[in-house]
Amino acid sequence: MLVVIMFFIAFAFCSWLSYSYLRPYISTKELNKSRMFYIT
């Protein structure tokens, strides 16, 4: 039972970490796309 809880916590932590890493990359990508569209 404890192993399942630990696995769930690790999975949630990894998903949160990947989300926090990918969110600024996605936002800057969208920003650059809109900026290029605005320039052209």
From Swiss-Prot:
Concerning PTM, the database record says: Unglycosylated because produced in viral factories instead of the classic ER -Golgi route.
**In its UniProt record, which GO terms are filed under biological process?**
symbiont entry into host cell
State where the protein is found.
Virion membrane
The membrane-spanning stretches of this chain are 2-22
The recorded induction information for this protein reads: Expressed in the intermediate phase of the viral replicative cycle.
Does Lipid metabolism show up as a keyword for this record?
A: no
User: What keywords tag this UniProt record?
Assistant: Late protein, Membrane, Transmembrane, Transmembrane helix, Viral envelope protein, Viral penetration into host cytoplasm, Virion, Virus entry into host cell
Instruction: Locate the coiled-coil region(s) and give their ranges.
Output: none
Report the GO terms under cellular component: membrane; viral envelope; virion membrane
Record's bilayer topology term: Single-pass membrane protein
Ranges per topology, Virion surface: 23-40
Keyword Secreted belongs to the record: no
* Subunit structure, interactors included: Component of the entry fusion complex (EFC) composed of OPG053, OPG076, OPG086, OPG094, OPG095, OPG099, OPG107, OPG143, OPG104, OPG147 and OPG155. Except for OPG095 and OPG053, each of the EFC proteins is required for assembly or stability of the complex.
Its family remark reads: Belongs to the orthopoxvirus OPG076 family.
Role played: Component of the entry fusion complex (EFC), which consists of 11 proteins. During cell infection, this complex mediates entry of the virion core into the host cytoplasm by a two-step mechanism consisting of lipid mixing of the viral and cellular membranes and subsequent pore formation.
**The protein's name in its UniProt record:** Entry-fusion complex protein OPG076
The species this protein was found in: Variola virus (isolate Human/India/Ind3/1967) (VARV)
Gene symbol of the encoding locus? OPG076
